Amino acid sequence: RSAAFVLSAALAGQTLATGFVPQNVQAAQEGTQESTTETGKLIDMKAAIEPVKASYGYYVDVYQTNTSANLTPESNASIGVLSKMLDIFTPGDDWNTGTVLDQTTHQANLDKVKEITANRTEEEKTRAYLDDRRNQNYSMTEGLGGYAQTFIDGAEGQTSITDTIPEDATTVKYDDAYGDNAPWANTDGTYGNIAKLVNTIRGGAASTSSAKKYYKYMRPFRWSRLNGEYPQTTIISSLKPQEKADPSNDGGYPSGHTNGANLAAIAMAYAVPQQYSQMMLRSSELGNSRIVAGMHSCLDVIGGRMMSTAIAAANLNAEDNAAVKAKAVADGQKLVETVGAASDYESYQKDKETYLYRMTYNLKLDNADTTKEMVVPKGAEVLLETRFPYLSADERRYVLYTTGISSGYSVLDDAEGWGRLNLFEASNGYGAFATDVTVDMDAEKG
Protein backbone atom coordinates (compact mmCIF):
# COMPACT_ATOMS: atom_id res chain seq x y z
CA ARG A 1 0.00 0.00 0.00
CA SER A 2 1.21 3.50 -0.70
CA ALA A 3 0.00 7.06 -0.38
CA ALA A 4 1.38 10.33 -1.67
CA PHE A 5 1.03 13.84 -0.30
CA VAL A 6 2.78 17.18 -0.68
CA LEU A 7 4.56 19.03 2.12
CA SER A 8 4.65 22.75 1.40
CA ALA A 9 7.77 24.90 1.41
CA ALA A 10 5.83 27.07 3.84
CA LEU A 11 7.21 24.64 6.41
CA ALA A 12 10.75 25.79 5.60
CA GLY A 13 12.71 26.28 8.78
CA GLN A 14 10.46 24.02 10.86
CA THR A 15 12.24 21.16 12.60
CA LEU A 16 10.73 17.74 12.02
CA ALA A 17 9.19 15.87 14.89
CA THR A 18 11.47 13.37 16.59
CA GLY A 19 11.27 9.97 14.97
CA PHE A 20 9.77 11.21 11.69
CA VAL A 21 11.41 9.34 8.84
CA PRO A 22 10.17 10.34 5.38
CA GLN A 23 9.64 7.43 3.01
CA ASN A 24 10.56 7.82 -0.68
CA VAL A 25 10.74 11.61 -0.39
CA GLN A 26 10.94 13.09 -3.85
CA ALA A 27 11.67 16.81 -4.18
CA ALA A 28 10.54 18.18 -7.54
CA GLN A 29 13.59 18.47 -9.76
CA GLU A 30 12.07 20.34 -12.68
CA GLY A 31 13.36 23.87 -13.15
CA THR A 32 14.80 25.99 -10.37
CA GLN A 33 13.72 25.11 -6.86
CA GLU A 34 13.45 28.16 -4.65
CA SER A 35 12.60 28.67 -1.00
CA THR A 36 12.21 31.78 1.11
CA THR A 37 14.08 31.83 4.42
CA GLU A 38 12.90 33.51 7.62
CA THR A 39 14.88 36.60 6.58
CA GLY A 40 13.10 36.74 3.24
CA LYS A 41 16.15 35.63 1.26
CA LEU A 42 15.31 33.58 -1.82
CA ILE A 43 17.40 30.40 -2.13
CA ASP A 44 17.98 28.38 -5.28
CA MET A 45 17.91 24.98 -3.59
CA LYS A 46 19.46 23.09 -6.48
CA ALA A 47 22.40 25.48 -6.40
CA ALA A 48 22.51 25.35 -2.60
CA ILE A 49 23.51 21.69 -2.54
CA GLU A 50 26.16 22.02 -5.24
CA PRO A 51 29.61 21.12 -3.85
CA VAL A 52 32.34 23.72 -3.42
CA LYS A 53 35.87 22.85 -4.48
CA ALA A 54 38.66 23.38 -1.95
CA SER A 55 42.26 24.37 -2.72
CA TYR A 56 43.23 20.68 -2.67
CA GLY A 57 40.26 19.68 -4.86
CA TYR A 58 37.29 17.59 -3.77
CA TYR A 59 38.23 15.34 -0.86
CA VAL A 60 36.46 12.27 -2.20
CA ASP A 61 38.43 12.56 -5.45
CA VAL A 62 41.88 13.17 -3.96
CA TYR A 63 41.77 11.41 -0.57
CA GLN A 64 44.75 9.25 -1.48
CA THR A 65 46.97 12.34 -1.39
CA ASN A 66 47.06 11.80 2.37
CA THR A 67 50.61 10.43 2.45
CA SER A 68 53.82 11.42 4.20
CA ALA A 69 55.15 12.71 0.87
CA ASN A 70 52.55 15.50 0.82
CA LEU A 71 52.86 17.98 3.65
CA THR A 72 50.94 21.09 2.62
CA PRO A 73 47.22 21.99 2.72
CA GLU A 74 47.19 22.16 -1.07
CA SER A 75 48.91 18.84 -1.71
CA ASN A 76 47.38 16.72 1.08
CA ALA A 77 43.59 16.64 1.37
CA SER A 78 43.64 15.68 5.05
CA ILE A 79 45.87 18.61 5.92
CA GLY A 80 43.74 20.83 3.71
CA VAL A 81 40.38 19.94 5.25
CA LEU A 82 41.79 20.95 8.65
CA SER A 83 43.34 24.20 7.45
CA LYS A 84 41.03 26.59 9.34
CA MET A 85 43.38 25.84 12.22
CA LEU A 86 45.78 28.19 10.46
CA ASP A 87 43.51 31.06 11.52
CA ILE A 88 44.37 30.15 15.10
CA PHE A 89 47.91 28.81 14.96
CA THR A 90 50.88 28.93 12.60
CA PRO A 91 53.12 25.84 12.83
CA GLY A 92 56.80 26.39 13.54
CA ASP A 93 59.84 24.49 12.38
CA ASP A 94 59.93 22.51 15.62
CA TRP A 95 57.28 20.99 17.88
CA ASN A 96 57.23 23.97 20.26
CA THR A 97 58.02 26.97 18.04
CA GLY A 98 54.63 27.68 16.49
CA THR A 99 52.85 31.03 16.79
CA VAL A 100 49.41 31.53 18.31
CA LEU A 101 47.44 33.93 16.09
CA ASP A 102 44.06 33.75 17.81
CA GLN A 103 44.87 33.88 21.49
CA THR A 104 41.19 34.05 22.49
CA THR A 105 40.26 30.75 20.83
CA HIS A 106 43.50 29.06 21.83
CA GLN A 107 43.01 30.07 25.46
CA ALA A 108 39.35 29.00 25.42
CA ASN A 109 40.39 25.63 24.00
CA LEU A 110 42.83 25.00 26.84
CA ASP A 111 40.49 26.46 29.47
CA LYS A 112 37.84 23.97 28.37
CA VAL A 113 40.32 21.11 28.80
CA LYS A 114 41.11 22.32 32.30
CA GLU A 115 37.40 22.50 33.13
CA ILE A 116 36.74 18.98 31.85
CA THR A 117 39.79 17.37 33.46
CA ALA A 118 39.24 19.13 36.78
CA ASN A 119 35.76 17.65 37.07
CA ARG A 120 36.35 14.13 35.74
CA THR A 121 34.74 11.38 37.80
CA GLU A 122 36.20 7.96 38.55
CA GLU A 123 33.77 6.44 36.08
CA GLU A 124 34.91 8.89 33.40
CA LYS A 125 38.55 8.11 34.16
CA THR A 126 37.90 4.40 33.69
CA ARG A 127 36.09 5.07 30.41
CA ALA A 128 38.97 7.28 29.25
CA TYR A 129 41.49 4.54 30.07
CA LEU A 130 39.52 1.87 28.21
CA ASP A 131 38.95 4.13 25.21
CA ASP A 132 42.65 4.89 25.08
CA ARG A 133 43.94 1.34 25.41
CA ARG A 134 41.37 -0.66 23.44
CA ASN A 135 41.29 -0.93 19.69
CA GLN A 136 38.82 1.76 18.62
CA ASN A 137 37.02 -0.75 16.39
CA TYR A 138 36.16 -2.89 19.39
CA SER A 139 35.21 0.14 21.47
CA MET A 140 32.74 1.27 18.82
CA THR A 141 30.78 -1.99 18.99
CA GLU A 142 29.06 -0.55 22.06
CA GLY A 143 27.21 1.78 19.69
CA LEU A 144 25.43 -1.27 18.28
CA GLY A 145 23.38 -1.33 21.47
CA GLY A 146 21.17 -4.40 21.66
CA TYR A 147 22.97 -5.90 18.67
CA ALA A 148 26.48 -5.50 20.12
CA GLN A 149 26.96 -8.80 21.96
CA THR A 150 25.51 -10.88 19.14
CA PHE A 151 27.85 -9.14 16.72
CA ILE A 152 30.86 -9.68 18.99
CA ASP A 153 30.00 -13.35 19.44
CA GLY A 154 29.45 -13.94 15.74
CA ALA A 155 32.42 -11.94 14.49
CA GLU A 156 34.62 -13.18 17.35
CA GLY A 157 35.40 -9.64 18.45
CA GLN A 158 38.03 -9.45 21.14
CA THR A 159 40.17 -7.18 23.29
CA SER A 160 42.81 -7.96 25.89
CA ILE A 161 42.02 -4.79 27.85
CA THR A 162 39.66 -5.83 30.65
CA ASP A 163 36.99 -3.62 32.20
CA THR A 164 39.07 -3.22 35.35
CA ILE A 165 42.16 -1.01 35.28
CA PRO A 166 45.23 -2.94 36.54
CA GLU A 167 46.66 -1.60 39.79
CA ASP A 168 50.08 -1.12 38.20
CA ALA A 169 48.72 0.75 35.16
CA THR A 170 50.31 3.93 36.51
CA THR A 171 53.73 2.47 35.76
CA VAL A 172 53.12 -0.33 33.25
CA LYS A 173 51.93 0.26 29.69
CA TYR A 174 49.17 -2.13 28.63
CA ASP A 175 48.52 -2.52 24.91
CA ASP A 176 45.57 -4.25 23.32
CA ALA A 177 46.81 -7.57 21.97
CA TYR A 178 44.10 -7.37 19.33
CA GLY A 179 45.10 -4.12 17.73
CA ASP A 180 47.99 -3.75 15.33
CA ASN A 181 49.36 -7.25 15.88
CA ALA A 182 46.23 -9.42 15.74
CA PRO A 183 42.71 -9.09 14.30
CA TRP A 184 40.11 -7.42 16.54
CA ALA A 185 37.45 -9.53 14.78
CA ASN A 186 37.28 -12.47 12.39
CA THR A 187 36.39 -11.15 8.93
CA ASP A 188 35.48 -14.69 7.88
CA GLY A 189 33.15 -15.23 10.81
CA THR A 190 29.45 -14.53 11.19
CA TYR A 191 28.91 -10.82 10.51
CA GLY A 192 32.56 -10.72 9.47
CA ASN A 193 31.82 -8.49 6.50
CA ILE A 194 30.94 -5.68 8.89
CA ALA A 195 34.41 -6.00 10.40
CA LYS A 196 35.87 -6.12 6.90
CA LEU A 197 34.17 -2.82 6.01
CA VAL A 198 35.53 -1.24 9.19
CA ASN A 199 39.03 -2.42 8.30
CA THR A 200 38.65 -1.23 4.71
CA ILE A 201 37.62 2.28 5.65
CA ARG A 202 40.24 2.58 8.37
CA GLY A 203 42.88 1.41 5.93
CA GLY A 204 41.98 3.84 3.14
CA ALA A 205 44.46 6.73 3.36
CA ALA A 206 43.17 7.34 6.87
CA SER A 207 46.25 8.14 8.97
CA THR A 208 46.47 11.37 10.97
CA SER A 209 50.28 11.26 11.01
CA SER A 210 50.87 13.73 8.17
CA ALA A 211 48.41 16.25 9.59
CA LYS A 212 49.96 16.00 13.04
CA LYS A 213 53.41 16.47 11.55
CA TYR A 214 52.30 19.55 9.62
CA TYR A 215 50.31 21.38 12.30
CA LYS A 216 52.56 20.67 15.29
CA TYR A 217 49.84 21.83 17.68
CA MET A 218 50.81 20.54 21.10
CA ARG A 219 48.79 18.30 23.35
CA PRO A 220 47.24 20.17 26.32
CA PHE A 221 49.62 18.81 28.95
CA ARG A 222 52.55 20.10 26.91
CA TRP A 223 51.00 23.56 26.64
CA SER A 224 50.73 23.39 30.44
CA ARG A 225 54.48 22.93 30.71
CA LEU A 226 55.31 25.83 28.41
CA ASN A 227 56.55 28.65 30.66
CA GLY A 228 53.59 28.18 33.01
CA GLU A 229 51.59 30.49 30.75
CA TYR A 230 48.61 28.22 30.12
CA PRO A 231 46.13 26.26 32.28
CA GLN A 232 47.64 23.36 34.18
CA THR A 233 46.17 20.05 33.04
CA THR A 234 47.37 16.51 33.61
CA ILE A 235 46.92 13.07 32.09
CA ILE A 236 44.99 10.60 34.23
CA SER A 237 47.48 8.57 36.25
CA SER A 238 46.58 5.23 34.63
CA LEU A 239 47.62 6.62 31.23
CA LYS A 240 50.87 8.19 32.34
CA PRO A 241 52.92 5.37 30.72
CA GLN A 242 51.37 6.30 27.36
CA GLU A 243 53.02 9.71 27.30
CA LYS A 244 55.71 9.74 24.62
CA ALA A 245 59.15 10.80 25.73
CA ASP A 246 59.83 12.50 22.39
CA PRO A 247 57.39 15.40 21.91
CA SER A 248 58.66 16.17 18.41
CA ASN A 249 56.62 13.31 16.97
CA ASP A 250 53.53 13.58 19.14
CA GLY A 251 51.31 16.42 17.93
CA GLY A 252 47.76 16.80 19.17
CA TYR A 253 45.87 18.09 16.11
CA PRO A 254 44.02 16.08 14.91
CA SER A 255 43.25 13.35 17.43
CA GLY A 256 44.14 9.93 16.02
CA HIS A 257 41.90 8.01 18.43
CA THR A 258 38.94 10.21 17.50
CA ASN A 259 39.70 9.72 13.83
CA GLY A 260 39.85 5.94 14.17
CA ALA A 261 36.73 5.73 16.31
CA ASN A 262 34.64 7.84 13.96
CA LEU A 263 35.78 5.84 10.94
CA ALA A 264 34.75 2.61 12.67
CA ALA A 265 31.47 4.15 13.82
CA ILE A 266 30.51 5.35 10.35
CA ALA A 267 31.35 1.94 8.88
CA MET A 268 29.17 0.17 11.45
CA ALA A 269 26.39 2.73 10.99
CA TYR A 270 26.51 2.11 7.24
CA ALA A 271 26.12 -1.63 7.80
CA VAL A 272 23.56 -1.34 10.61
CA PRO A 273 21.74 1.95 9.90
CA GLN A 274 19.15 1.18 12.58
CA GLN A 275 21.87 2.19 15.04
CA TYR A 276 23.15 5.22 13.15
CA SER A 277 22.44 7.85 15.82
CA GLN A 278 23.81 5.66 18.58
CA MET A 279 26.98 4.95 16.60
CA MET A 280 27.56 8.69 16.17
CA LEU A 281 26.95 9.28 19.87
CA ARG A 282 29.41 6.55 20.88
CA SER A 283 32.01 8.03 18.55
CA SER A 284 31.55 11.45 20.13
CA GLU A 285 31.86 9.87 23.56
CA LEU A 286 35.24 8.38 22.70
CA GLY A 287 36.38 11.72 21.32
CA ASN A 288 35.29 13.45 24.51
CA SER A 289 37.11 10.83 26.57
CA ARG A 290 40.36 11.96 24.94
CA ILE A 291 39.82 15.33 26.59
CA VAL A 292 38.82 13.71 29.88
CA ALA A 293 42.06 11.71 29.73
CA GLY A 294 44.06 14.92 29.33
CA MET A 295 45.54 13.56 26.12
CA HIS A 296 43.86 15.97 23.70
CA SER A 297 42.26 19.37 23.48
CA CYS A 298 38.81 20.13 22.12
CA LEU A 299 40.24 21.37 18.81
CA ASP A 300 42.20 18.12 18.45
CA VAL A 301 39.02 16.09 18.85
CA ILE A 302 37.01 18.32 16.51
CA GLY A 303 39.74 17.93 13.88
CA GLY A 304 39.71 14.16 14.25
CA ARG A 305 35.96 14.04 13.61
CA MET A 306 36.17 16.37 10.60
CA MET A 307 38.98 14.47 8.93
CA SER A 308 37.47 11.04 9.53
CA THR A 309 34.08 12.08 8.16
CA ALA A 310 35.73 13.06 4.89
CA ILE A 311 37.85 9.90 4.82
CA ALA A 312 34.82 7.69 5.43
CA ALA A 313 32.86 9.34 2.63
CA ALA A 314 35.80 8.98 0.25
CA ASN A 315 36.17 5.28 0.96
CA LEU A 316 32.43 4.64 0.76
CA ASN A 317 32.42 6.34 -2.66
CA ALA A 318 35.37 4.31 -3.94
CA GLU A 319 34.24 1.85 -6.63
CA ASP A 320 36.71 -0.75 -5.39
CA ASN A 321 34.78 -0.93 -2.11
CA ALA A 322 31.35 -1.59 -3.63
CA ALA A 323 31.42 -5.33 -2.95
CA VAL A 324 32.55 -5.10 0.66
CA LYS A 325 29.89 -2.44 1.28
CA ALA A 326 27.11 -4.64 -0.07
CA LYS A 327 28.25 -7.66 1.93
CA ALA A 328 28.54 -5.59 5.11
CA VAL A 329 24.99 -4.29 4.70
CA ALA A 330 23.74 -7.83 4.13
CA ASP A 331 25.48 -8.96 7.32
CA GLY A 332 24.08 -5.96 9.15
CA GLN A 333 20.51 -6.77 8.24
CA LYS A 334 21.08 -10.42 9.12
CA LEU A 335 22.26 -9.22 12.53
CA VAL A 336 19.15 -7.07 13.00
CA GLU A 337 16.83 -9.89 11.98
CA THR A 338 18.60 -12.36 14.26
CA VAL A 339 18.41 -10.19 17.36
CA GLY A 340 15.08 -8.55 16.68
CA ALA A 341 15.98 -5.65 18.97
CA ALA A 342 14.65 -2.13 18.51
CA SER A 343 16.64 1.09 18.67
CA ASP A 344 16.29 3.07 21.89
CA TYR A 345 15.23 6.65 21.19
CA GLU A 346 14.03 7.45 24.70
CA SER A 347 16.96 9.81 25.29
CA TYR A 348 16.90 11.34 21.82
CA GLN A 349 16.70 15.00 22.87
CA LYS A 350 19.47 14.67 25.45
CA ASP A 351 21.68 12.72 23.05
CA LYS A 352 21.05 15.28 20.32
CA GLU A 353 22.19 18.12 22.58
CA THR A 354 25.21 16.17 23.80
CA TYR A 355 26.35 15.37 20.28
CA LEU A 356 25.90 18.95 19.11
CA TYR A 357 27.93 20.27 22.04
CA ARG A 358 30.76 17.85 21.31
CA MET A 359 30.82 18.98 17.69
CA THR A 360 31.90 22.48 18.74
CA TYR A 361 32.57 22.69 22.50
CA ASN A 362 31.13 26.18 21.99
CA LEU A 363 34.47 27.43 20.67
CA LYS A 364 33.49 30.51 18.71
CA LEU A 365 34.64 34.12 18.62
CA ASP A 366 32.08 36.76 19.60
CA ASN A 367 32.35 38.39 16.17
CA ALA A 368 32.24 35.13 14.20
CA ASP A 369 30.08 35.09 11.07
CA THR A 370 27.19 32.76 11.85
CA THR A 371 25.25 33.52 8.66
CA LYS A 372 27.20 31.61 6.02
CA GLU A 373 25.09 29.25 3.93
CA MET A 374 25.50 25.55 4.58
CA VAL A 375 27.79 23.74 2.14
CA VAL A 376 27.43 20.02 1.43
CA PRO A 377 30.67 18.32 0.36
CA LYS A 378 30.89 16.35 -2.85
CA GLY A 379 30.07 12.71 -2.17
CA ALA A 380 28.89 13.29 1.41
CA GLU A 381 25.45 11.91 0.53
CA VAL A 382 26.94 8.40 0.56
CA LEU A 383 27.11 8.65 4.35
CA LEU A 384 23.29 8.34 4.42
CA GLU A 385 23.02 5.83 1.58
CA THR A 386 21.79 2.95 3.72
CA ARG A 387 20.02 5.07 6.32
CA PHE A 388 17.70 6.48 3.64
CA PRO A 389 17.82 4.00 0.74
CA TYR A 390 14.54 5.38 -0.60
CA LEU A 391 16.00 8.87 -1.13
CA SER A 392 17.93 9.96 -4.20
CA ALA A 393 21.48 11.28 -3.89
CA ASP A 394 20.24 14.87 -4.17
CA GLU A 395 17.58 14.25 -1.55
CA ARG A 396 20.17 12.93 0.86
CA ARG A 397 22.20 16.07 0.16
CA TYR A 398 19.12 18.10 1.14
CA VAL A 399 19.00 16.18 4.42
CA LEU A 400 22.63 17.08 5.11
CA TYR A 401 21.97 20.68 4.08
CA THR A 402 19.00 21.08 6.42
CA THR A 403 20.70 19.46 9.42
CA GLY A 404 24.11 21.14 9.19
CA ILE A 405 25.16 23.38 12.08
CA SER A 406 25.56 27.14 11.79
CA SER A 407 28.80 28.71 10.64
CA GLY A 408 31.26 30.55 12.86
CA TYR A 409 32.59 27.77 15.07
CA SER A 410 36.36 27.45 15.35
CA VAL A 411 38.03 25.34 12.59
CA LEU A 412 34.66 24.02 11.34
CA ASP A 413 34.12 26.35 8.37
CA ASP A 414 36.23 24.41 5.89
CA ALA A 415 35.65 25.16 2.20
CA GLU A 416 33.82 21.91 1.39
CA GLY A 417 31.61 21.77 4.48
CA TRP A 418 32.83 18.63 6.26
CA GLY A 419 33.07 20.37 9.63
CA ARG A 420 29.43 21.43 9.74
CA LEU A 421 27.87 18.05 8.89
CA ASN A 422 25.79 16.84 11.84
CA LEU A 423 25.44 13.12 11.18
CA PHE A 424 23.49 12.49 14.37
CA GLU A 425 20.78 14.88 13.21
CA ALA A 426 21.02 13.86 9.57
CA SER A 427 20.42 10.23 10.50
CA ASN A 428 17.00 11.28 11.79
CA GLY A 429 15.85 12.85 8.54
CA TYR A 430 15.22 16.33 7.18
CA GLY A 431 15.91 19.19 9.56
CA ALA A 432 13.50 21.38 7.59
CA PHE A 433 11.57 21.32 4.33
CA ALA A 434 13.47 23.70 2.11
CA THR A 435 11.26 23.02 -0.95
CA ASP A 436 7.89 21.51 -1.76
CA VAL A 437 8.42 17.81 -1.08
CA THR A 438 6.31 14.93 -2.35
CA VAL A 439 6.26 12.01 0.07
CA ASP A 440 5.38 8.53 -1.20
CA MET A 441 4.67 6.40 1.85
CA ASP A 442 5.25 2.72 1.15
CA ALA A 443 4.03 0.46 3.94
CA GLU A 444 6.31 -2.35 2.78
CA LYS A 445 9.34 -0.17 3.56
CA GLY A 446 8.39 0.55 7.15
Annotate the PLM regions.
Residues 257-261, 292-321:
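Alpha-helical transmembrane segments that form the membrane-embedded catalytic/substrate-binding core
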Residues 328-343:
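Extended charged low-complexity segments that act as oligomerization/scaffolding linkers
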Residues 29-292, 337, 354-446:
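Hydrophobic alpha-helical bundle signature of multipass membrane enzymes
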Residues 325:
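Active-site- or binding-pocket-proximal scaffold segments within functional domains
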Residues 344-351, 355-357:
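A conserved mid-domain beta-alpha-beta active-site/ligand-binding segment of alpha/beta enzyme cores
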Residues 13-30:
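Sec-dependent signal peptide cleavage junction
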Residues 1-12:
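Sec-dependent N-terminal signal peptides
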